[in-house]
A protein has these predicted regions:
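Cytosolic-side membrane-insertion boundary helix
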Residues: 272-301, 320
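Alpha-helical transmembrane signal-anchor/signal-peptide segments
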Residues: 26-51
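Juxtamembrane loop-helix boundary motifs flanking transmembrane segments in multi-pass membrane proteins
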Residues: 1, 32, 36, 278-286, ...
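Generic detector of multi-pass transmembrane helix bundles and their immediately adjacent loops
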Residues: 298-431
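Soluble non-transmembrane domains of integral membrane proteins
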Residues: 35, 39, 46, 56, ...
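Intrinsically disordered or highly flexible coil/loop and linker segments, enriched in small
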Residues: 50-54, 135, 396, 422
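Membrane-proximal extracellular/periplasmic loop immediately following the first transmembrane helix
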Residues: 63-72
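Hydrophobic alpha-helical transmembrane signal-anchor segments
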Residues: 2-28, 32
Length: 431
């Protein structure tokens, strides 16, 4: 090109794009570290308890149905009658008609190396009623029934986390829980065999039991078609209410939260995937913030290069492309330092140290050319890093804040260069 400024601008633009390669590599490193963190957390959960889902209890009554088939036929002019006794084994499942849950959850952390998993211990109390229909009798006119010992089944997704299961009280008597659901409709959980329960002449059976359950990340309850009320309390200030049903009311404070749910049987419909769920999450996770911060790499390097170009034009300084490259690499190193330090110190402290190191390095590199330039860039980069930190901390307003920042920077450039004679600067050099 005939104009050296245009040629240099093109070179600097290519340099900025080239510096996206190390920034992209750092983003890949963040994803790799996040995957390793997830593996460590999953390993801790394997030994403590995974995400837990507890289903409403239901009564399982095995029975034998007996009936007689009478076959009449005429043989040699005589009517003969043959009676055949038939029997089959079946299961009657009676879901709870109403369940009240009380859940008190305490959270803790366990570490594996530098990675930490958020775990919980839940004290769960359940009480309710199971309706026994009229057909649960010994005869119905055409068939005879032999009823075996019923059992109460409670589905629990990860039985490893069951720390204690006190005896269930059903119909005024107590029965011990046994491992496993012992029912084809549940894959994991507990059951209690009700030996000698006289359910034939009862319209409803009251029940109650208590569980001590350990898990990680989230806790959910499945109503399974029952009228359900839930009162939950936990010492975690950042709950995420998930599942099919949101709480009717909740109160969230610095020391934790309380929440209450009311779900009717008409809303629940008995589906296992329709749950009341709470996830114990960070509002903005560490690796999520690191990944979001690395997305601003192009903005940081591009704005710094543009500031250098403007300074070169307005102050008539000579800044070599190598200097652009070195400053750009220092800016890229910020994200690597941030990733490495945050795993040990936390995001806030790591951000402050990485910012201080990079601003000090770039300012020291520029101070020999001009103290004023070094001070200007040091203050400008510090302000830029401060704005970025605010954007990262405010997930809901990050787009709005970023848009306003770019608009303010564009306005500053436009107003600051109103008197610049761009034709004179970019005119081809005379021979």
């Amino acid at each position: 090109m005939k104009n050296p400024l245009v040629a240099k601008a093109a070179l600097i633009g290519a340099l900025v794009l080239g510096l996206m390669i190390p920034v992209g590599m750092i983003r890949g490193l963040v994803a790799e570290r996040q995957a390793r963190s997830n593996e460590a957390i999953a390993g801790i959960a394997e030994g403590w308890g995974k995400r837990q889902s507890v289903a409403s209890p239901y009564l399982v009554i095995p029975y034998e149905r007996q009936w007689t088939v009478i076959k009449r036929e005429t043989i040699d002019g005589k009517l003969r009658e043959t009676r055949t006794e038939l029997r089959e084994l079946q299961v009657l499942r009676l879901p709870a008609s109403s369940v009240s849950w009380t859940v008190d959850t305490a959270l803790s952390e366990k570490a594996r190396g530098i990675y930490k998993a958020r775990l919980y211990s839940a004290h769960i109390t359940a009480s309710g009623m199971i309706d026994v229909p009229a057909r649960a009798s010994s005869e119905d006119g055409t068939s005879r029934y032999r009823w075996y010992n019923p059992k109460l089944v409670v589905g629990i997704s990860d039985p490893l986390g069951i720390r204690a299961a006190r005896a269930v009280r059903l119909g005024g008597k107590e029965y011990a829980f046994r491992p496993g659901p012992d029912d084809a409709n549940a894959t994991a959980g507990l059951h209690a065999v009700m030996e000698g329960v006289a359910f034939m002449n009862r319209e409803a059976l009251p029940f109650s039991f208590t569980l001590e359950l350990a898990g990680s990340e989230a806790l959910s309850l499945a109503p399974l078609g029952a009228d359900t009320t839930v009162a939950m309390r936990a010492d975690w200030p950042h709950p995420s209410f998930q599942g099919r049903f949101l709480p009717a009311k909740h109160d969230i404070g610095k020391s934790g939260f309380t929440a209450d749910w009311r779900v009717s049987r008409f809303a629940a419909q008995g589906a296992k995937n329709e749950t009341i769920a709470v996830s114990f999450i960070e509002p903005v996770g560490l690796y999520q913030m690191l990944e979001r911060a690395s997305k601003y790499g192009f903005l940081f390097i591009g704005l710094t290069a543009a500031a250098f170009m403007l300074l070169e034009i307005l102050r008539r300084l000579a800044i070599h492309p190598i200097q652009y490259a070195l400053v750009g690499l220092a800016l890229a190193m910020f994200f690597l330092l941030l990733t490495a330090l945050s795993e040990h110190l936390g995001f806030g402290a790591a951000y402050a140290l990485a910012t201080s190191a990079c601003v000090a390095l770039i300012s020291a590199y520029l101070v020999r050319s001009s103290r004023a330039v070094a001070l200007f860039f040091g203050c400008g980069l510090t302000a830029l890093y401060a704005v970025l930190y605010a954007l990262l901390q405010s997930e809901d307003y990050s787009l709005l804040g970023g848009s306003l920042l770019l608009f303010a920077l564009l306005a500053a450039v436009m107003l600051g260069t109103r008197r610049v004679d761009w034709y004179g600067i970019t005119a081809p050099a005379s021979r």
